Amino acid sequence: MYIDAATLPSSAVLLDVDGTILDLAPTPLEVVVPPELTIALERLSKRTGGALAFVSGRPLAELDLFFQPLKLPSIAGHGAELRLNDGTVARANTFLDPQLKADLASIADDKPGVVVEDKNYSVAIHYRQAPHLGHAVRDEVSAVCARFPSTAIEILPGKSVVEVKQPSFNKGTAVRELMQHAPFKGRRPIFIGDDVTDEAAFAVLPEFNGVGFSVGREVQGIAGMFEQPSDVRRWIAEMVLTKKDAK
């Protein structure tokens, strides 16, 4: 619909996960990966010569768990982890202060429906099940982080979530690094993302003559927009459709 399948052999397809190819769920561990999506992703990887990668805020281990048996090249943890096509993994060597993580976790103690997710390199406070507490959660996250003035901290607001991480890495810096390695090098990246946390990746696309597509929200400079994750899944299926499948 948006990209001619004939361009796939010269493209690199980069996909955010939650809210982009998977529907959002009440909690991070409740997301559902349709079996047909895993099959389509495997085909898409072959169509692109292996130049298909996840670009996610989730830890690498979770991506592997949800999409098994696939182990695609991946940018995980908002750029803290980078797995290349040959399986090698580079990881950031900076971590959040343990006391900061503990204080952030305590935000949920008196807030039913608020879920704290420790992602190793970041902490996410989800309020999807308690949207009325969104303002309180955001205010408390800011207050907690203000108690650690000597610590480099980045606060990322998202869809019913606030994430706290080190500012030394993000999806954009990781995409830039990924594009230096085979089979991504020299290809035109196609990135699809849905949230504020994806904007760093959108920002580096012009460096590689890339194109970006958002899901459910307008983003400056993008080439187009999908309404919802099911539309992205449908697009992926169409990109890998063979003549035999069409019969």
Where are these regions (language model features)?
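The start of beta-strands in P-loop NTPase/AAA+ ATPase cores
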Residues: 11-13, 18, 51, 72, ...
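Active-site phosphate-binding/coordination module
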Residues: 32-119
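Residue-level signal for inorganic ion chemistry
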Residues: 19, 74, 125, 175, ...
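Substrate-recognition "cap/lid" segment bordering the active-site pocket of phosphatases
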Residues: 77-103, 156-186
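Mg2+-dependent phosphoryl-transfer enzymes with acidic/Ser/Thr/Gly-rich catalytic loops
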Residues: 8, 34, 172-247
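Charged, glycine-interspersed solvent-exposed loop segments at helix/strand-loop junctions
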Residues: 114-132, 152-165
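Substrate-recognition/cap helix-loop segment adjacent to the acidic, metal-dependent catalytic center
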Residues: 58-77, 133-153
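Non-catalytic pre-domain segments flanking phosphatase-related domains
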Residues: 1-17, 21-25, 29, 36, ...
